[in-house]
Amino acid sequence: LFTREFYGNCYNALKADGIMVNQQGSPFYSEDAHAMQRSHKRIASTFQISRVYQAHIPTFAAGYWLFGFASKKYHPVDDLDSEAWSALNLRTRYYTTRLHRGAFYLPAFLEEMLQEVED
């Protein structure tokens, strides 16, 4: 399922301002970590913008999970409009724009794993 062809089809299905998000597993399990690297490499070779972000999900194995973000147009941090979000006056128990930005700042070991497949 998660082949270059699959991600190419996702790319083609999206409009110019479309965003694709996918699960990438936990980096603490070797098999998941390698799958994350393969997936990131394929997505990064398909989309102009590709980033990995993190979340703590206690019901998932290891409680620490990675996701992929890909877009033809939008950068998940640089294009975040905090003022527009604030203007919505939505009160959430979890999401904040600070948390949004922070999710994309990865620990050194993950940055190294991603750099291995980006080079």
Q: What kind of region is each of these model predictions?
A:
Residues 1, 30-31:
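Alpha-helix capping and helix-loop boundary segments enriched in small/acidic/polar residues
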Residues 17-24:
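Conserved beta-strand signature within the Rossmann-like core of class I S-adenosyl-L-methionine
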Residues 61-63:
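Short acidic/glycine-enriched loop/turn segments that link adjacent beta-strands
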Residues 2-16, 44:
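A short glycine-rich, Lys/Arg-flanked "PGG" loop and its adjoining helix->strand segment in the class I
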Residues 41, 65-119:
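SAM/dcSAM-binding transferase cores
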Residues 25-29, 57-59:
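Short "lid" loop at the C-terminus of a central beta-strand within the Rossmann-like core
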Residues 7-8, 33-56, 68-70:
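Conserved Class I S-adenosyl-L-methionine
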